[in-house]
Structures are given as C-alpha cells and as structure tokens.
Regions:
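Glycine-rich flexible loops
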Residues: 1-164
C-alpha cells in the first residue's frame, strides 16, 4: 500500500496546500446553501502527482479541517487520511482519469439545481450572459447511483459532447 511518506517533499507540500483549499471550499458550500447535512463534496487533483484530495465520508461540514481531508490515488485508494473517503471518490477518480485537463470537481445539492436535474433536461440558455459564459444550454448529466464510478461516467459522457 502506498502512503504519503512514499512521495517527495514537493508532493507533500502540495498535498498540505490542497487540503487547506479543499477544506475551505467545503465551508463555502455551506455558506452559499449549496449542500445539506453531509451531501456533496469537493475534490482537487494534484499537479505534482496522480493524487487527489477529497472530503471524508459522513463527516458533517462544520467538523471538516485540512487534516481531515483524505488523499487518494486516481483509482480511489487511500494514500493518507484517518477517515474513509467520500462515497463519491470512485466517480471523482473516474473523471480525473478520463479528463486529464480537469483538476477540480464540485458536487453540490443546491435546491434549484437538484430540482432541475430531476427533470433530466439541460438548463436552457435564456440570457445573453449565460450564452457568453456557457456558449449555450448548461448540460445535465444522467441520474446515477452513488458509490461507484457511475456518476463520474455520466459526467464524462455528458461533458465530452460539448466543446471546451
């Protein structure tokens, strides 16, 4: 089993910095009412190694700290952390393996986005500023169950249909 100690000082320094960023981003999810209870998560891929940092499973947002963030390889195996990683770890890892230009994943459960996603329809481009920002409708991925690569596969399949 690989551990964080197997990596050099550059990687360990980046892990420390990314843990701080990912923990802080989770607090922003609460601040902006984008999640409830323990649902949703943020992860970030490292630039210096094929590793990612993600929140632990089941830990309430108010208890998240940089040291509670879990470091995993891009197959979802834990490299460092005291807790089990998020139940969405396999999906985040799938996205990073299949979209190498992606360095961050944010999975929220905001009320309006969740309600819209239940319709299975793309969000129409109804404003000029949406067209400027997104280039057209905002794609909505297919429904998938958590706990496997399924959500990640749905995200990759959906996003690969659209130009960058």
């Amino acid at each position: 089993m690989v551990s964080l100690a197997d990596f050099g000082p550059e990687v360990r320094a980046e892990v420390k910095q990314v843990r701080e960023v990912v923990a802080a981003l989770h607090q922003q999810l609460i601040k902006w009412n984008l999640v409830v209870w323990t649902a949703g998560n943020v992860s970030q891929r490292l630039h210096s190694a094929d590793l990612m940092v993600i929140k632990p499973s089941g830990l309430r947002y108010e208890y998240l700290t940089p040291s509670s963030m879990v470091v995993c390889d891009l197959d979802g195996n834990v490299v460092d952390g005291a807790e089990a990683p998020s139940s969405d770890t396999a999906s985040h890892a799938y996205i990073y393996r299949n979209m190498p230009d992606v360095y961050g994943v944010v999975h929220t459960h905001s009320t309006y986005a969740t309600a819209w996603a239940a319709t299975g329809q793309n969000i129409p481009c109804g404003l000029t500023m949406m067209g400027d920002e997104f280039g057209g409708p905002v794609p909505v991925g297919p429904f998938r169950l958590i706990g496997s690569e399924a959500i990640g596969k749905g995200v990759v399949e959906t996003l690969k249909k659209y130009p960058k």
